[in-house]
Amino acid sequence: MGSIEVAERTTVGLAAKDPSGILTPYTYTLRNTGPDDVYIKIHYCGVCHSDLHQIKNDLGMSNYPMVPGHEVVGEVLEVGSNVTRFKVGEIVGVGLLVGCCKSCRACDSEIEQYCNKKIWSYNDVYTDGKITQGGFAESTVVEQKFVVKIPEGLAPEQVAPLLCAGVTVYSPLSHFGLKTPGLRGGILGLGGVGHMGVKVAKAFGHHVTVISSSDKKKKEALEDLGADSYLVSSDTVGMQEAADSLDYIIDTVPVGHPLEPYLSLLKIDGKLILMGVINTPLQFVTPMVMLGRKSITGSFVGSVKETEEMLEFWKEKGLSSMIEIVTMDYINKAFERLEKNDVRYRFVVDVKGSKFED
């Protein structure tokens, strides 16, 4: 169907107004549905650790007011005249990006997350010159290219964290050829992304070792998530015994930390895959890499194509996210708890079931 002609479309969300990171109601305008756009009523939105970085200006790039949230699941209310992949009433997803140049090597290769002109779903400037706002809001308008199809049968609240955390671990395992059953993988850090790493790696048939700074999460890692073993990084004997045992490590730690203890765990040709957003330099001595032909690499979320592939995989394997559902009136408390790592393992905001007041 074509665009509905309205003078101005507004929506209300929860926005950070300054680096305190406190979210309060904020009304703003949305563009009308263009020919390639999808107008979405938001039902759920996941809470990511990078949202915390953004609302508090930890990376020094925040612009206010800012409506965060980039793990969006909602219902299609309207589609533009050129939209063929989606129809009114469908449940769809939107991840971290809402724009790209569509002409560079990354875009031509369908890995638009590496486009140098990508447009973030919030805290960025869209092609019309307006500031993008995220998923802690009643509704949004997104170009169809960046809208994700969700397989029937997946619960929408379960899907939300997959749109960032889920594809963040799926993408590098797929790209680096680490989907083969029988591989031995390590998951460093057991937070929102880490718990997804355990689930995805186990679904690929890998032997999974969770690596953490203490044994506080040992029981849940082994019993709740199904990890095969658990390593405490300060356990010198245990770390020595595990040397040269892993094909890869997914490093999800979002703060500065030494790399050398974990490089020693890798086999020859093993990969340490960095995923945490860290704004301080990481250090290591080169022989730790050279003497095993090991690689330190990184990966950044995933493309729309990879996300849809991951969702089909998730459905096929019958996996589920471990989430805590909250409403908008709890969001500031949720961020406080997230900052203390007090969540198992991902907050998901029930936007549809929340009340907004401005």
Curated annotation (Swiss-Prot):
Zn(2+) 2 binds at C101, C104, C107, C115. It catalyses: (E)-cinnamyl alcohol + NADP(+) = (E)-cinnamaldehyde + NADPH + H(+); (E)-coniferol + NADP(+) = (E)-coniferaldehyde + NADPH + H(+); (E)-sinapyl alcohol + NADP(+) = (E)-sinapaldehyde + NADPH + H(+); (E)-4-coumaroyl alcohol + NADP(+) = (E)-4-coumaraldehyde + NADPH + H(+). PROSITE patterns: ADH_ZINC (PS00059). It is an enzyme of class 1 (oxidoreductase). InterPro entries: ADH-like_C (IPR013149), ADH-like_N (IPR013154), ADH_Zn_CS (IPR002328), CAD-like (IPR047109), GroES-like_sf (IPR011032), NAD(P)-bd_dom_sf (IPR036291), PKS_ER (IPR020843). This is Cinnamyl alcohol dehydrogenase 1. One of its GO terms (biological process) is lignin biosynthetic process. SMART domains: PKS_ER (SM00829). NADP(+) binds at residues 50, 168, 189-194, 212-217, 252, 276, 299-301. Keywords: Lignin biosynthesis, Metal-binding, NADP, Oxidoreductase, Zinc. Belongs to the zinc-containing alcohol dehydrogenase family. Involved in lignin biosynthesis. Catalyzes the final step specific for the production of lignin monomers. Catalyzes the NADPH-dependent reduction of coniferaldehyde, 5-hydroxyconiferaldehyde, sinapaldehyde, 4-coumaraldehyde and caffeyl aldehyde to their respective alcohols. Can use coumaraldehyde and, with a lower efficiency, coniferaldehyde and sinapaldehyde as substrates. GO terms for molecular function: cinnamyl-alcohol dehydrogenase activity; zinc ion binding.
